Each structure stands twice: as C-alpha cells, then as structure tokens.
C-alpha cells in the first residue's frame, strides 16, 4: 500500500466502521428504551404493515367486547323490568281467581277490580319508562337493534324487544256467540245437557229440577253442573241467561247443546208431558276472542274467569320475551369469551413482530458499545499514520 498524506485509507475505513457501530448502538438504545423493535418503517417495512393490521384488529376486538357488554346490560335491564311485569300479572291473576269465587259480593269484586286497574297502569308505566342509554325498551319503539361484536364490518348480533304494555299483552279464548235463556220449572224433572267442544271431551250433564224453582235458580244450577263437568268450558249464569267461555287454545268450531230430555213428573214417577226448566241452546259455536290485559275487568265472575285466561297468555308472552333475552345474554357471554381469546392470540402475534427481545437486544447493545470504543481507539491510531511520512523527510 502506498504511503500518502492526502488520502488516509485506514482512517476512512475506521470511520465507516465506527459510523456503522454508532448507528447500530443508537438503534439498540432506541429499541431498549421504547420496547418496540419497529420504531420506523426502515426498521422492518413488511413487519410494520403486518403489525398495524394486527393492531387494528386488536383495537376492534376491544371495542367489540365493550359493545357486547353493552348488549348484556341492555338485555338485563329489559329482563329485569319484565320480571316485575310478571310479578304484576301474577298478582292480577290472584285477584282474578279471588273475584271468580262465588263468596264475593258485588262490592268486593269492585274493590278487587280497583286494584287490577292500578296494576294495569303500573304495567304501562314500566313499559313507558324502562330505558337504556336514553332509549326506551318496552314501549314498542325499540324494534330490533344490531350490536357490532366483531373487529370487521357487519359482524353483528341482533336483539329484538316487543312492546310489553298492558294494551299489547293479550290472550285468546273462545266465547259463545250468544246467550241462552232458561225458563222456570213447571214440574220437577231432569234436564239432560250434552256439552263439549271440538278437540276436547264431551259429557252429558244431568241437572235435577224442582217444580217451584225460578228461572234464575234453574240457570244457576245448570251453570254449576257444566262447571263441575270440567271439560274446559266455563258456564256463567246472569239472571235467567247462561253464557259460556272456553279455555284458550281450544278449537273455536266446537258447539254446545242444551236440551231437555227424559223429563220425569215427580208426583207420578212416569214420563209425561210436563216440563222441567226449559233450556234453549246457549250457543252453536264459539267465537275466537282476543282481549288485552288493559281491558281486563274482574267486577263480575265471568269477567274474572276470562281475565285468568288472558293473563295466562300474557305471562306466556313475557316468558317468551324473557327467554329470548336470556338466550341473547348467553350468546353475548360466549361472544365476549371468543373475542378475548382472539384478542389474546392476535396480540401475541403482534408482539412477536414488533416487541423488543430484551435478551437479544442487550447483547447487541454490549457488542456495539465495544465496537464503538474499539473503533474510536483505532481511529486515533489511524489518524497518526500520515505522520510517519515525516520520518522520510528528515
């Protein structure tokens, strides 16, 4: 190698190596101080792109978890209100059964009905005031809401809540489309009544009548006999008129027939021309009737019996809605568990890409520190090489 003064190759080479070790030392210091292996795109362009995508997914999963928790809270709010509505309906049912009892006077039934009216208002109040985040849940305006429970678009769970006011809660039962009149007994005898509905059992009911009974007494006896038959039909006497109500779910095409047969004259013991109480057919068919909880009136025994049927159906409606809300809460719970699992694994993958390996980076730091110190010492010696030319000039 030529001995020159203007160009010090050894010094230039040492400077280059010293710059490289200094740059590596700065990189190690930055990685150790930030905890991140990728601090700019130049550190790992492809890794930066992948890590950013994974970061977006992790952030989305965290938001989705919060959204799912909001969904659980909303469902719990609605379900709690429906529990109270169920309690109210159970109380109304108790009052209806109490009113249906024959020991109650008209004034007692009126008092019982007064409490029912207050409970109807409370049902409406719960429906109108149950809110979550300012949004009403049970007044019918909620409809169906979608909860974003994923890190990508359109990963949703839909929750629907129906109206649960007293007016919307309804029950179906079958009411005879007409009433039958009963005439007073003119002779003692037996009234034979064939009663039943389609899809249910049918029985013959025999009612013994006395010759001196009024039409009202005869009607009460016939109604009691029908009720005792327990074939799913309720009979109610009002004066000399009998009306019928069938339980919800029974076929409305059924018919009731009431006819006098085999009348026996009490004083002769033989069949004759005298008649016991005359009964005209109460109904030839049932008409399907839909009543709401808001229309319940238990001021009469007949109304109380119908109220029980309506309330039973209303409780079924609420139970169905509560079951849906319970199911969606379980779904949200499972979704949250899955989101947490995904988030954990995605975070681990991102960490492997962008996090600093402190063991390896500390080793790099030590190496670069030694190289920098050595390079500085060697550079000092390299810079002294041109001075050797002076010995040739002496």
Curated annotation (Swiss-Prot):
Tell me the domain of life: Bacteria
A single Gene Ontology MF term assigned here is: structural molecule activity
Q: Which keywords does the record carry?
A: Bacterial flagellum, Glycoprotein, Phosphoprotein, Secreted
Q: Which InterPro entries match?
A: Flagellin (IPR001492), Flagellin_C (IPR046358), Flagellin_C_sub2 (IPR042187), Flagellin_N (IPR001029)
Modifications made to the protein after synthesis = Phosphorylated on tyrosine residue(s).
Q: Which cellular compartments is it found in?
A: Secreted; Bacterial flagellum
Q: Major location, coarse class?
A: secreted
List the GO terms this entry assigns under cellular component, sorted alphabetically: bacterial-type flagellum; extracellular region
Family the UniProt entry places it in: Belongs to the bacterial flagellin family.
What function does this protein fulfil?
Answer: Flagellin is the subunit protein which polymerizes to form the filaments of bacterial flagella.
Q: What is this protein called?
A: A-type flagellin
Provide the species name: Pseudomonas aeruginosa
């Amino acid at each position: 190698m030529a001995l020159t003064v203007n160009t010090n190759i050894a010094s230039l080479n040492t400077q280059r190596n010293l710059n490289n070790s200094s740059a590596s030392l700065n990189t190690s210091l930055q990685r150790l101080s930030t905890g991140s292996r990728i601090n700019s795109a130049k550190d790992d362009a492809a890794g930066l792109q992948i890590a950013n995508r994974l970061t977006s997914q992790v952030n989305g999963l965290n938001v989705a978890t919060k959204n799912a928790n909001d969904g659980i809270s909303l469902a719990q709010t609605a379900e709690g209100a429906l529990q109270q509505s169920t309690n109210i309906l159970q109380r109304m049912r108790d009052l209806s059964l109490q009113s249906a009892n024959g020991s109650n006077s008209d004034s007692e039934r009126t008092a019982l009905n007064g409490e029912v009216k207050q409970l109807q208002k409370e049902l409406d109040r719960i429906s109108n005031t149950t809110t979550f985040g300012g949004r009403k849940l049970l007044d019918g305006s909620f409809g169906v809401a979608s909860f974003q429970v994923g890190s990508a678009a359109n990963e949703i769970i839909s929750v629907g809540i129906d109206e649960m006011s007293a007016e919307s809660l309804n029950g179906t039962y079958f009411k005879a489309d007409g009433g039958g009149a009963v005439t007073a007994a003119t002779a003692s005898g037996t009234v034979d009544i064939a009663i039943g509905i389609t899809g249910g059992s049918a029985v013959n009911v025999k009612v013994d009548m006395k010759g001196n009974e009024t039409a009202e007494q005869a009607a009460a006896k016939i109604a009691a006999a029908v009720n005792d038959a327990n074939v799913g039909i309720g009979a109610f006497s009002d004066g000399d008129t009998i009306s019928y109500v069938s339980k919800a779910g029974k076929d409305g095409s059924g018919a009731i027939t009431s006819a006098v047969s085999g009348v026996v004259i009490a004083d002769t013991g033989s069949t004759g021309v005298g008649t016991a109480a005359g009964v005209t057919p109460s109904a030839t068919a049932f008409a399907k009737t839909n009543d709401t909880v808001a229309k319940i009136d238990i001021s009469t025994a007949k109304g109380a019996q119908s109220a029980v049927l309506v309330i039973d159906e209303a409780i079924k409606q609420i139970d169905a809605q509560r079951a849906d809300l319970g199911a969606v809460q379980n779904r949200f719970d499972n979704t949250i568990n899955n989101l947490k699992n995904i988030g954990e694994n995605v975070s681990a993958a991102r960490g492997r890409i962008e996090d600093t390996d402190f063991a390896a980076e500390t080793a790099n730091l030590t190496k670069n520190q030694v190289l920098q110190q050595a390079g500085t010492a060697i550079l000092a010696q390299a810079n002294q090489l041109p001075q050797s030319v002076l010995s040739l000039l002496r």
